[in-house]
Amino acid sequence: MFLLSKKNILINFLFCLLFSFLSFESLISDDALKKAILSEDRTTEYVKRDRYRNPLETLSFFQIKKNMTVIELQPSGGISPTGWYTEILAPFLRKNGLLIAAHFNPSESEWRKNMRRTFEEKVKYDKNYNKIQMSMLSMPPRKLTKDNSADMVLTFRNLHNWLKSGYLKEVFQVSYNALKPGGIFGVVEHRAPDNFEISDMKKQGYVSEKLTIKLAKEVGFILKDKSEINANPKDSKDHPNGVWNLPPTLKVNDDKDRDKFLNIGESDRMTLKFIKPKN
């Protein structure tokens, strides 16, 4: 009885020690993430959008850690050629982890070629970007990196583009293949009502949670959690130019409408966390 008691004490002690270590590691990652977000190296126009994009809350929800291998899918966008989230992820992962940028295939269009060139220039000369490993997400998608090697794959506001190109499920599949068992697939996307048809989603630039979860499950993912961090109840999803009416694009037919769309703010977005099962 005495030996059993000693054994239980030892087990409890080791469990507490492990829990304390994991908590300490989490605190270190949280501090490093806050430091990256508050860095003066970030582009001023990007920082102004923090109130809409909620980077600390979003990346914490995805449970990112500074020693992870993370793939960011097609990080550049029209008004964020150097990658809005990349400016946070690159310095955060630079020392102990790895950021892989699965960028555009430059042969697919002149616009994609220019976007990739701008991004690669930043990788070449910027001290925060120079440890980024470049990869490619083509249409149709091919292997992103070595199978079962990444801890996390992240995509921010890209799903509507892949849906329009006809390769959304295929992007999910190559993301699944790249992840280790237990790896996390983090998705942020303009959220369509579930009654939107595929044609509506392609035209308006919003994708439904229902379709996203369905396709992710079809390639093997399990939905672990969802969050309303990036929700915006002011967004009716009924705009003449779709999601592009809203900031930051503000594609308006009449300048007098700008204030109306600025008042709405950036889109209502789903924030979904999937995992690749361990077995």
Segments and roles (model prediction):
Residues 66-81:
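Conserved class I S-adenosyl-L-methionine
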Residues 90-93, 168-181:
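A short glycine-rich, Lys/Arg-flanked "PGG" loop and its adjoining helix->strand segment in the class I
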Residues 198-226:
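Conserved Class I S-adenosyl-L-methionine
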Residues 236-279:
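Core SAM-dependent methyltransferase catalytic element
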Residues 143-153:
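A short acidic, Gly/Pro-enriched loop at the edge of an enzyme's catalytic core
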Residues 99-102, 182-190:
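Conserved beta-strand signature within the Rossmann-like core of class I S-adenosyl-L-methionine
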Residues 67, 95-96, 179-185:
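Short glycine-dipeptide loop
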Residues 50-69:
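Conserved alpha-helix/loop element of class I SAM-dependent methyltransferases that forms part
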